């Protein structure tokens, strides 16, 4: 009722290397910490910076430009990979992008049910909860309930579409623009949150002073 699940998850041929690389990185990290060459707190800070600030700021610029530039938005919806590359954001985990536009009638959210595929060039590193089995399974079976746990209550008359990322394809949500007619593109980008581009949140509402 008011929700659908787009399951197009072709992980055939999705080999072990990503997991192998992750294990090697973890082993190297443990060795460096053990030898006192790396401060674990400092490493956590770097990860948090890329997870919350550096990566998502790229996506925020894409969203803000789409909000203010109808021609760019049209290109973004038609060929997201090329339109995102126009702003200089491309690379590993972002070779084939699709933009999911939220509307007054439809709210989009994406998940990777089999692993943790995520659009690194625009959103940075995936948050821990995105990789968790609970999110990956429950977002498909009970999206409305899971979104409510994130503090995002979707009206019953609004359709929720859950998109399952593939090994080849990466999604990013284009959230609805808040009431910000007087905002510049740069100001709008500051309102775009990482979670609003995943679909588990909304953009920050503008302050009354604006």
UniProtKB/Swiss-Prot annotation:
Q: Does the keyword Lyase apply?
A: yes
Binding residue positions for Co(3+): 112, 115-117
Lyase in keyword set:
yes
* InterPro entries linked to this entry: CN_Hdrase_a/SCN_Hdrase_g_sf, CN_Hdrtase_a/SCN_Hdrlase_g, CN_Hdrtase_asu/SCN_Hdrlase_gsu, Nitrile_hydratase_asu
* Keywords for the protein's UniProt record, in alphabetical order: Cobalt, Lyase, Metal-binding
According to the record, cofactor stoichiometry and binding are noted as:
Binds 1 Co(3+) ion per subunit.
Q: Which GO terms describe its molecular function?
A: nitrile hydratase activity; transition metal ion binding
**EC?**
4.2.1.84
Catalysed reactions listed for this entry: an aliphatic primary amide = an aliphatic nitrile + H2O
One Pfam match: NHase_alpha
Q: Where is the signal peptide?
A: none
What cofactors are annotated for this protein? Co(3+)
Q: What is the similarity comment for this entry?
A: Belongs to the nitrile hydratase subunit alpha family.
Describe the protein's quaternary organization and the partners it interacts with: Heterodimer of an alpha and a beta chain.
Task: Provide the function of this protein.
Answer: NHase catalyzes the hydration of various nitrile compounds to the corresponding amides. Industrial production of acrylamide is now being developed using some of the enzymes of this class.
* Designated name of the protein: Nitrile hydratase subunit alpha
């Amino acid at each position: 009722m008011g929700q659908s699940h787009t399951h197009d998850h072709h992980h055939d041929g999705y080999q072990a290397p990503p997991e192998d690389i992750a294990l090697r990185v973890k082993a190297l990290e443990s060795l460096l910490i053990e030898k006192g060459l790396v401060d674990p707190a400092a490493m956590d800070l770097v990860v948090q910076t890329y997870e919350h600030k550096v990566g998502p700021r790229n996506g925020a610029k894409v969203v803000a430009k789409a909000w203010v530039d109808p021609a760019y938005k049209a290109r973004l919806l038609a060929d997201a990979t090329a339109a995102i590359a126009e702003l200089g954001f491309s690379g590993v985990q972002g070779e084939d992008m699709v933009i999911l536009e939220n509307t007054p009638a439809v709210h989009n959210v994406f998940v990777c049910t089999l692993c943790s595929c995520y659009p690194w060039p625009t959103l940075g590193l995936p948050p821990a909860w995105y990789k968790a089995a609970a999110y990956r399974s429950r977002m498909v079976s009970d999206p409305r309930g899971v979104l409510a746990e994130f503090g995002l209550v979707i009206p019953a008359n609004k359709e929720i579409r859950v998109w399952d990322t593939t090994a080849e394809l990466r999604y990013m949500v284009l959230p609805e623009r808040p009431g910000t007619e007087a905002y510049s593109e740069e100001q709008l980008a500051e309102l775009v949150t990482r979670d609003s581009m995943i679909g588990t949140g909304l953009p920050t509402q503008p302050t009354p002073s604006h």
